[in-house]
């Protein structure tokens, strides 16, 4: 259930209300972002409303209206600003109260707009967070030279993280650069290590379907089936970020994958929406905006840079005094992870559409914390809508869970058959930085 960590969620709640006075509440839309959320109330007639902060993490929206709001409570998992929207105790008999629970301290503003006899009130909630650190100084000069490549006949979905002309990038520095190569997995007999992240767990059940099916139980079942498929294939080794009903933080999941020397991470979830007719699977990859913010964070954390996998950690451990090199290496690492993630997501979608409905036919981009690692390419798979009666029954079915695991496995296998992992001796690709050229992707096309 990752409706709360997408770039923006637009959810419609149907309302059955008995109008009192001139205005009737007709619709609610919620856009839930990482640091900002918008709740849009639509009215027929000029509304009478008010809002107040019951605490820094709770906002009460009062509307002159009676009736029953269907679709509440709307529960999010807590990775974005809004944690839940629920009905509250009204202050009088002529008022409805919506209570918005936040994951962080927040501040609220309201703007009313009119369109003929229709009105909207937009409540904008901003997280009360300290300002971000200033951006690092310009630390690298890039010289981009297009290379001539043969046009492709057709592609089902173009990878936006690939340059259209397969560019090479020169990084000018006084140091010597070792290019981060796709890492070998010698300790496991050159197997490709796939970290499988079963979403939620423990006190966090995730989404709960109309029949009571809990997302955390669906995700761990699919994850275990996927691990079995991977471990039965000599190409792979599957490892779980959790193998029981317990909670792991978003950051902790990436750390577990890194400790396992994972080459790729698959996070498994089940979607949910107030619109109970929504169906289908989708696959999500890290957005550029989140990648840029994560890169700035890694540049600040010099002591953690050496933990990065794939050769980048070794390079950065010896470049503490050279911010030019640090940014260049991290930029290459994030770019590589995004490109690989998008291509694997495309491969998975082609398999998922063979077994069921597809909600998004191309990989979607979002600010997802579990996909934040620059050194581990990753995707998040929404296996279907647990909020839909039919898909809830499918997701709870052992047979369909097996089909989902097989689709994810085949997507991984098809990608890595076409793009075998390569290893290189440390320093084998070293060149002087003024002449180094780095291919558009580390894994060959």
From Swiss-Prot:
This is N-acetylmuramoyl-L-alanine amidase AmiB. NCBIfam families: PRK10431.1. One of its GO terms (cellular component) is outer membrane-bounded periplasmic space. It comes from Escherichia coli (strain K12). Residues 1-22 form the signal peptide. GO terms for molecular function: N-acetylmuramoyl-L-alanine amidase activity. Residues 194-413 form the MurNAc-LAA domain. One of its GO terms (biological process) is cell division. Its EC number is 3.5.1.28. SUPFAM superfamilies: Zn-dependent exopeptidases (SSF53187). Cell-wall hydrolase involved in septum cleavage during cell division. Can also act as powerful autolysin in the presence of murein synthesis inhibitors. Keywords: Cell wall biogenesis/degradation, Hydrolase, Periplasm, Signal. Residues 424-445 are annotated as: Disordered. Gene3D superfamilies: 2.60.40.3500, Zn-dependent exopeptidases.
